[in-house]
Amino acid sequence: MNLLIQGGRVIDPSQGIDEVLDILVENGAVKELGKGVKAPSGTETIDASGLIVTPGLIDMHVHLRDPGHEYKEDIVSGTKAAAAGGFTSVACMPNTKPVNDNKAVTSYIIAKAKAEGSVNVFPVGSITQGSKGELLSEMGELKESGCVAVSDDGHPVTNSELMRRALEYAKGMGIMVISHAEDLSLVGAGVMNEGFVSTELGLKGIPWAAEDAATARDVYLAEFTDSPLHIAHVSTKGSLRIIRNAKARGVKVTCETAPHYFSLTDDAVRGYDTNAKMNPPLRTADDVTAVKEALKDGTIDAIATDHAPHHIDEKDLEFNEALNGIVGLETSLTLSLRLVEEGVLTLPVLVDKMACNPAKILGIDRGTLKPGSVADITVIDPKATWTVDADKLASKSKNSPFLGWEVKGAAAFTIVGGKVVYKR
């Protein structure tokens, strides 16, 4: 099927493009970019006047819960949520049941996504077998099977020697290590950020030092082994300072943050709202300011959701008992566009952090609109206003702290391999 996207503001940082152009798609690939592009007869046309056209957005950190926890989410519902949020590709974390530490699980995910998914799914394998932090997974097998990275997300590797070896082996295999940087001995029984609000609410806190200490360890190990390292969901000003300094020294470290870390503070926990409970926890206003500064100065390379669906029975509990995590695929774009309105980022820089950089970090052939590239394209309506409504979310789970928010900006069309998979 051929497709012509006409008259949109095309933003493609991979080519330094930011101008009104047409895009012709043929046989699932970008054929031509230009003004007044002529299309063959019978070509479907999208009028993108007043809209923004970008390389397909990539969320490099989601939990699809499939296999094993399909009552929370599965590949079908999760990829529908991704498409509705403007994402053409997602990278899914390995904390499934069974854990994705082998070829069989990876192959299952890829096959199901190809057969039933709405968007591209790139599996992330586990660093250690069963994510138990004891024995390294067969990283070569995982990469050959289709994994684009390895991570023990949600279960940080506490053994420093093991983490060192993981970085060394991953470097040799040419696969990225994604670190969930938290010192679990400092996290303890904490359920929110340690500070004034936790004291006021009588909830046990998690100190910023838990993230900072683990970030420092992993950055130094990456420096020692001269290995690439990606730090997931950065939330503290201290960890950002560590990463910024490491980059200045030439350490091969990249990092991401999530929209909730620049949109909310730990004040959101007041009222004991379990939809404001996640890991790492929401931090202070100073941390939010630091996250925005790090997005602006390039310390933070990518925006990823850490989409973590949970059934209502796992969230509608006392705060201490509720599970960590929130859904984010369908609110990420609109929350991130607020950074442009606030003057934190320009649109091209935002696209870089939501499409181009995730592709580079994961080493996948996406994140560009160059002729010949796969036609994964996001068309954004920056003026669309809507309310975050649980009943309208495509995700099976509704655990979002943004329910009821009046927001601006949304995906108008999501195009995967030249096929429209979502239309607003």
Swiss-Prot record:
Q: Which cofactor does it need?
A: Zn(2+)
Q: Which NCBIfam families match?
A: pyrC_multi
Q: What does this protein do?
A: Catalyzes the reversible cyclization of carbamoyl aspartate to dihydroorotate.
Q: Which family, according to UniProt?
A: Belongs to the metallo-dependent hydrolases superfamily. DHOase family. Class I DHOase subfamily.
Which residues are listed for Zn(2+) 2 binding in this entry? 153, 180, 233
Specify the protein name.
Dihydroorotase
**GO terms under biological process:** 'de novo' UMP biosynthetic process; purine nucleobase catabolic process
Query: In Gene Ontology terms, what is one molecular function of this protein?
Result: allantoinase activity
Q: Which gene encodes it?
A: pyrC
Q: Which SUPFAM superfamilies match?
A: Composite domain of metallo-dependent hydrolases (SSF51338), Metallo-dependent hydrolases (SSF51556)
**HAMAP family recorded for this chain?**
PyrC_classI_B
Protein EC: 3.5.2.3
Pfam families according to UniProt: Amidohydro_1
Q: What are the UniProt keywords, alphabetically?
A: Hydrolase, Metal-binding, Pyrimidine biosynthesis, Zinc
